[in-house]
Amino acid sequence: MLQALLLGLCGAYGHIDWGIGTPFLNRPLVLGPIVGLILGNVEQGIIIGATLEVFFLGAMAIGSYIPPDACVGGVLGTAFAIKAGLSAEMALAMAIPIAIIATSFQNILWSIFSMTSKIADRYADQGNEKGIAAIMFME
């Protein structure tokens, strides 16, 4: 249970770059060793993280293209492979579909969040700064 919580925090750490710019903390090369440390196999975490990084290396959001989520795919692919004792190639085979599914859920959430701007507009009309801040924090 503790490992699952720590892996969730590792994923949150990977997504913190959305709020502070783009230091590329969400890359499998960064998160793989952290996942390996959490699960007790840093060496395998480095190997799997590097393998996944090669796949996700060119995955950048340009225009309307949203690439597979390297953070979720990297963390979960590395974790599943380490726990199951699988190779880096098998981790890649798991990480790609996980990353694509995560991106699909992300698109759904962003669509829902676009509707909350109307609520923020209402709060702005009322002069409710705390309401606006709450909506912006939620998004």
Stretches with model-predicted labels:
Residues 8-12, 34, 79, 95-103, ...:
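Transmembrane helix-bundle signature of multi-pass membrane transporters/permeases
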Residues 93-139:
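Helix-loop-helix junctions within the multi-pass membrane cores of secondary transporters/permeases
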Residues 11-18, 44, 81, 85, ...:
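Generic secondary-structure signature for well-ordered alpha-helical cores
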Residues 56-100:
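Long, highly hydrophobic alpha-helical transmembrane signal-anchor segments
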Residues 1-72:
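Hydrophobic transmembrane alpha-helices
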